[in-house]
Design a protein with these regions (language model features):
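Asp-based, Mg2+/Mn2+-dependent phosphohydrolase catalytic module
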Residues: 1-124
């Protein structure tokens, strides 16, 4: 909680966040994501995960959640058993363009609502 508080300067950008104290099983187990879905009250079919680590990717995929892998600044060799359907170098915005390394192509130069909606609907 202290890290989140420091990173966001005590501003309340999130309704909740989940730490290792909140779940019995940590990533790569799907429990952290499933708990987030439950607490949020949204449907699992309206969810999407952005991840940058092997444990997080395994966790999201085990929870059967549409997952976009965003490359980290840290050198990571992705596990071959993780079914990566989308890998990008950055989420992007109008000043920082997104490059799709693997996955559906963009209609714009960054990930937008339309892309996310199509990705969720075509995930299975």
């Amino acid at each position: 909680e202290l890290l989140v508080s420091k990173l966001f300067h005590d501003k309340n950008y999130f309704e909740f966040y989940i730490t290792s104290d909140d779940v019995k099983s940590l990533k790569p187990h799907p429990m952290p994501f499933l708990k987030a879905i439950k607490l949020s009250g949204i449907k699992i079919t309206n969810s999407i995960v952005f991840e940058d680590s092997n444990p997080g990717l395994k966790s999201a995929c085990s929870a059967n959640l549409p997952t976009i892998c965003v490359k980290s600044n840290l050198p990571i060799i992705y596990d071959k058993d993780i079914p990566l359907k989308c890998l990008v170098d950055t989420i992007g915005d109008v000043k920082h363009l997104t490059n799709i390394i693997k996955g559906p192509q963009l209609n714009r130069d960054y990930i937008d609502y339309e892309y996310l909606n199509d990705f969720i609907n075509n995930y299975q």
